[in-house]
């Protein structure tokens, strides 16, 4: 086998394969509840838009430098969770509720362009069209520059749990994710 073939096989094997219903949730839900731990260990959650990148084995989230508590919590303690529990506007019929537990990192860099992860912003503008309009307005960008200076958070799942029909009274299905590669 050629070197290119081996590289291709490695790329394929790195992908996180989840059941189709779970994949639909990751791609279809508008937001998730992103939970971090405060300095004293108290969990705190925020609604955030996510981008699922199975080939990269991660979720991408962003926050403004003006709302940086999420990133500061991640820098101190990278243990996080993403709960996909609200299917509003997803178009999905009877989706499962999905909990992702994992490790987050927030590189210590501020991005000034909304196109660092272009597919994230394409998704955001698709589900929040008014955001695209405001982002294109130079006056808005000037007055709200703090909002457009972004910190990126990358979450690598270690465990994924899902409850068919979002029935939390039932035992969840579970997928352990290895961190090989």
Predicted regions and their residues:
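Charged, gly/pro-rich active-site loop segments
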Residues: 2-16, 91-181
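Short beta-strand segments
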Residues: 29-66, 72, 81-85, 96
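Structural motif
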Residues: 56-58, 79, 103, 159
């Amino acid at each position: 086998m050629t070197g290119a073939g081996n590289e291709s096989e490695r790329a394929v094997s790195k992908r996180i394969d989840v059941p189709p219903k779970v994949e639909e949730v990751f791609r279809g839900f508008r937001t998730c509840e992103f939970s971090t731990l405060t300095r004293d260990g108290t969990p705190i959650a925020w609604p955030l838009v996510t981008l699922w990148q199975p080939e990269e084995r991660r979720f991408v989230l962003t926050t403004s430098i003006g709302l940086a508590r999420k990133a500061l919590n991640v820098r101190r303690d990278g243990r996080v969770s993403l709960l996909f529990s609200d299917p509003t506007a997803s178009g999905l019929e009877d989706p499962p509720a999905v909990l992702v537990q994992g490790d987050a990192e927030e590189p210590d860099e501020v991005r000034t362009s909304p196109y660092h992860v272009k597919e994230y912003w394409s998704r955001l503008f698709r589900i929040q069209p008014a955001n695209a309009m405001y982002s294109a307005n130079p006056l808005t960008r000037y007055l709200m520059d703090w909002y457009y200076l972004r910190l990126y958070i990358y979450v690598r799942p270690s465990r994924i749990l899902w409850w068919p029909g979002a029935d939390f009274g039932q035992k969840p299905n579970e997928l352990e994710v290895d961190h090989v590669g």
